[in-house]
Regions:
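Positively charged n-region of N-terminal signal peptides that target proteins for export
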Residues: 1-4, 369
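Conserved blade-ending motifs and adjacent loop-strand segments that build the rim/top face
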Residues: 329-349
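Active-site Gly/Thr loop motif
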Residues: 219, 264-275, 290-291, 319, ...
Length: 369
């Protein structure tokens, strides 16, 4: 009897320590809980299949595919944690395998009670105890100007196939900066990998931060992804409704706050996009809101029917939204109810889809077939 009890206890511990997998009748995929994290914000895969995961309060972690979580890395900059601010996105340099460069975005403090987003790059190494450390960290970009408040940082990043770095910069809940070309708030930014400004940027001759700008008129762009044609798309939170999926084009103005398919939270109306055809309109938009966070363009083999689709992390509906594109048109075709706010979504090396829940006690999920 004692041997049987010990055997059952051992099996019980094994089950509890292994990733938990489930499949519901409502979802066309299996969901495996890999790990639990505290306010995770972004993740990216290393060449060996492990994940780098950021937590908003300022921790950078290594997570194995079996759910083992490292101690927090050292060498990070000072993070201004609070409101919507903290440690944000993380991406690898396109030549990471040879240069070991990673890029992080985060909120930082300025003078007084002013804040702004920043992007830094560093060499990722591991010490003799296999503890992660960021070395030779350098800040390559900052929001300008820094302003009061702790919202709408944006600060998503994506490299294109030519090695240019694109950064989404929110308008910091100040409305008008999105149309102010003397600052880089409410813009999509295009830089070289070292933070220098390409001389073929549309406003390069204007100099200063204006030279960084690729497109303008953005509100709170929380997702950036390239499709299989190399075109850049972004998800963008509208005001009261009017969330957007935009095809981001060189030198185009996306209209906020002059136009939006949403309205101000005060109830004050904003003219719709169709009233101002001189601004670039979204390819699709949502009312009611989906509060879109990150998006990916799916190209894997595991979910063949999802190819040519964007998968969007939906905070408000607690769902993953699938959008199909056809040339320059876009249409939502499916919505998968996850039952919890979704902050981040990435495609794994084997075509599985990995998801980060939002908030404290948030799960890292792996979706498979």
């Amino acid at each position: 009897m004692n041997k049987l009890f010990l055997l059952l206890a051992a099996l019980s511990c094994l089950i509890l320590s292994s990733p938990a997998s489930s499949k519901t009748a409502d979802l066309p995929f299996s969901v495996t809980t890999v790990a639990e994290l505290d306010e995770p914000w972004a993740m990216t895969f290393l060449p060996d299949g492990q994940l780098l995961v950021t937590e908003k309060a300022g921790q950078l972690l290594l997570v194995s595919q079996s759910g083992e979580i490292s101690k927090p890395f050292s060498g990070l900059p000072e993070i201004a944690y609070g409101g919507q601010g903290g440690l944000g996105d993380i991406v690898l340099h396109p030549n990471y395998s040879s240069n070991r460069l990673i890029y992080i975005s985060y909120a930082e403090s300025g003078e007084g009670n002013q804040y702004g987003a920043a992007v830094a790059r560093a060499i990722l190494n591991f010490d003799d105890k296999q503890q992660g450390v960021l070395e030779n960290l350098e800040v390559i970009w900052r929001q300008s100007p820094k302003v009061s408040g702790k919202g709408h940082y944006g600060h998503r990043m994506a490299f294109d196939d030519q090695g240019f770095l694109f950064i989404s910069s929110g308008e910091r809940q100040k409305f008008d900066p999105a149309q102010d070309m003397t600052g880089n708030l409410g813009k999509i930014i295009r830089l070289h990998d070292d933070g220098s400004i390409p001389d073929d940027n549309p406003f390069f001759k204007e100099g200063g931060v204006t030279a960084q700008i690729w497109s303008s008129g953005h509100r709170n762009p929380l997702g950036l992804a390239f499709d299989d044609q190399g075109r850049l798309w972004n998800t963008e939170m509208g005001p009261l409704h009017g969330d957007e999926l935009n095809l981001v084009k060189r030198a185009k103005n996306y209209g906020y706050p002059t136009v939006s398919n949403g309205d101000h939270y005060s109830g004050k109306k904003i003219p719709d996009h169709d009233t101002r055809p001189d601004f670039e309109a979204p390819k699709t938009w949502w009312k009611p809101t989906i509060a879109p966070a990150e998006l990916i363009y799916y190209s894997g083999d595991m979910f063949v029917d999802w190819r040519n689709s964007f998968l969007i992390a939906g905070l408000k509906p607690k769902a993953i939204i699938r959008v199909v594109i056809d040339d320059e048109s876009a249409k939502e075709v499916e919505r998968f109810d996850m039952g919890v706010r979704i902050r981040e979504i990435e495609q794994g090396p084997d075509g599985a889809v990995w998801v980060l829940e939002d908030g404290t006690e948030a799960k890292l999920l792996k979706l498979t077939r």
